[in-house]
C-alpha cells in the first residue's frame, strides 16, 4: 500500500492527472522522488499517441507542445517563468529569492515563455515521428525527471522552505540518490545504444548548468529552479532529437 501511495504522492504533486488522495506522511514521501520519472512515461506515451494519429503536421506539432503542459498542469513552466524573472533582475541573491516567492508574472517571464514555446513548437514541427524516435523521446522524458529527482536529493538547498525543501527533507536521500543515479545511468546507456546519445548529453549539460546557476545565483536549488531545469532540459533534448534526425542518426 505504501508503494502505491508513494506513486500517488508523486503524481499528485508533479502532474495534473487524477489520482487517489492520501494523507502525505513520512512513509509515502520518503521515496516519492523515485516515482517522479514515471510521469515521464505518461508524457512519452501520450506523445507517441499524438505521433501515430492521422493529424496534419501543424496540428501534430501543437499536440506535441501541449502534451507535457496537459500532463503536468504547467507546474514546471511556472518555475521556469519565476526563475526567468529572477535571473533577469540582476539583483543580489536575496533579491532573486524574493522574486521566486512573488506570485506575479513579470515581463521577462512572459517574454521567455513566448520564446520558449516558439522554439518548442518549431522543433516539434521539425521532428519526424517514428517508433524509434518515440521510444527515445519517452526515455529522455524519464531521464530528465530522474536527474531532477537526483538533484533534489544531492544538490544544496537555497532555503529551508518550499517544495524542494519539503521533498528533500522527507526523502531517504542516500537511497534516492543511488536509485536515481542507477536509473539515469541505465537510461543514458540505452539512449546511446539506440543512437540518440545526443539527447542524454543534452540532459547532462542542462543538469551541469542547473547546478552552477543554482549555486552561484541562489545559493542552492529551489522548486522553481527545478522546474527551470526540467523545461530547459526538455527543450535542449528536443533540439538534440531534431538534429539527430537531420543528421540521419535516427
Residue positions per predicted region:
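Function-critical hydrophobic alpha-helical transmembrane segments in multi-pass membrane proteins
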Residues: 133-151
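N-terminal beta-alpha supersecondary unit
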Residues: 9-12, 26-51, 165-169
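Membrane-proximal soluble regions of multi-pass membrane proteins
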Residues: 1-24
